[in-house]
């Protein structure tokens, strides 16, 4: 088994993250809300976005195997409004060949620790209703379904629902 390192993202990871996102959005049965063309953004703006998130105290992690970014993970707080600064939005993607190897569990543990350390009161996420594996992972970490967005996305000639899930720390 290849060694998988989970670490904080850096600006230098921008190109690898973009490649990872393009790869996963190209999978025929993946549950992401963008196309490969939409994921293919210039490196410099992505690099700047990584820097900005880290400077704001957000959690931005990558998992790496043999020098390749194989997962991206974020917990982002919108600092625009004081009344919602206790809420962080979680996002995660893992390359197909590395799924079911505990990477998601390791990333979720890091998110819970980060949320407690930063005194985050609420972690929330959105997941496709058909993404049973991801939903199971989130439930394992105490996330609960709060609602459903019907016909949230239209991909591959059909509509998909999404679920809003959260975990409260307060």
Give the residues covered by each predicted segment.
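Conserved active-site alpha-helix within GNAT-family acetyltransferase domains
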Residues: 101, 105, 130-147
């Amino acid at each position: 088994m290849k060694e998988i390192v989970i670490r904080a993202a850096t600006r230098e990871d921008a190109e690898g993250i973009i490649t990872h996102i393009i790869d996963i959005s190209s999978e025929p049965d993946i549950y992401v809300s963008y196309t490969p063309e939409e994921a293919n953004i210039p490196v410099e703006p992505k690099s700047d976005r990584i820097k900005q998130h880290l400077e704001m105290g957000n959690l931005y992690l990558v998992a790496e195997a043999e020098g390749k970014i194989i997962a991206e993970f974020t917990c982002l707080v919108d600092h625009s409004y004081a009344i919602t600064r206790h809420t962080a939005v979680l996002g995660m993607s893992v390359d197909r060949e590395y799924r079911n190897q505990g990477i998601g569990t390791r990333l979720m543990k890091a998110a819970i620790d980060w949320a407690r350390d930063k005194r985050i009161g609420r972690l929330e996420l959105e997941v496709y209703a058909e993404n049973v594996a991801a939903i199971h992972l989130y439930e394992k970490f105490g996330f609960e379904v709060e609602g459903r967005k019907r016909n949230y996305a239209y991909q591959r000639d059909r509509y998909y629902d999404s679920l809003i899930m959260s975990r409260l720390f307060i």
